[in-house]
Regions:
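Glycosyltransferase catalytic domains, chiefly GT-A lineage
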Residues: 1-238
Length: 238
């Protein structure tokens, strides 16, 4: 299994990105790719300029499913792809997660933000336009898109294709005011994370304990996830 690791940064986060990438190399990833704005195909950029030109998330994080999809295209079936936010780095070996994903039937690891509910952090239009506006989705804990782990196979290629398609819809990914009334508990939209999270539930992808320091207090909720902290998620430019 060839292990790919990717991240993305604009000017502010380039130093943090380098630290993240260096830590991935240190812990044994075979190919470490540090993407930047210049790696986005001009045709894709201009097609989605209304989204990608926005400052929040350097384009509401649309680049994330784009680069995951782009990387999958160059990989062989059975290879591992890990996306990591540049505002984090590896402190310990990710081998426990590699062992876990190689046993996973779907080839996906998804990490749960226990207690952070979808209807609080996802605007109503996203539920409606993804045809997932029902309690089993709206009243569940969100999955994070800080780290996305995939084994390339037919299922994950199609999953990422769907992720990317929804992310190109301004009504779903951006902060445009929802035409459908938000749930009363709604606080703030989580953009590509809301999309990724809902797709994980749509396809019954198993939730796992967070791999950063934020997972330390969640061990009781995930007794089968015996791994300790693997990353430090700091969210800082340096």
């Amino acid at each position: 299994v060839k292990k790919y690791h990717i991240n993305y940064a604009n000017g502010r986060y380039l130093q943090a990105q380098k630290y993240c990438s260096d830590s991935a190399k240190q812990f044994g990833f075979d190919e470490v790719i540090s993407y930047s704005l210049s790696d986005i195909d001009p045709e894709f950029y201009f097609k989605n300029k209304n989204i990608l030109a926005q400052s929040r998330g350097a384009g509401f994080w649309l680049w994330k499913p784009y680069f995951i999809s782009k990387t999958l295209e160059r990989m062989e079936n059975g290879d591992l792809l890990v996306y990591s936010d540049s505002g984090s780095f590896y402190q310990n070996s990710p081998q426990p997660l590699i062992d876990l994903i190689l046993k996973d039937e779907k080839g996906v690891l998804s990490f749960e933000l226990k207690g952070l509910m979808e209807n609080v952090y996802t605007k109503r239009d996203t539920f409606v336009l993804m045809d997932l506006d029902e309690p089993k989705y709206t009243e569940s804990s969100q999955r994070e898109a800080t780290y996305i782990w995939l084994i390339k196979n037919d299922f994950t290629v199609n999953l990422v294709k769907e992720y990317l398609e929804y992310a190109q819809d301004e009504r779903i990914i951006t902060d445009l005011i929802s035409e459908n009334k938000n749930y009363d508990v709604f606080k703030d939209h989580r953009h590509d994370q809301s999309i990724w999270s809902l797709l994980c539930k749509k396809y019954n992808i198993e939730p796992h304990k967070l791999i950063s320091q934020w997972g330390d207090g969640m061990k009781n909720h995930f007794p089968n996830d015996t791994y300790n902290q693997i990353t430090l998620h700091h969210r800082n430019p340096i």
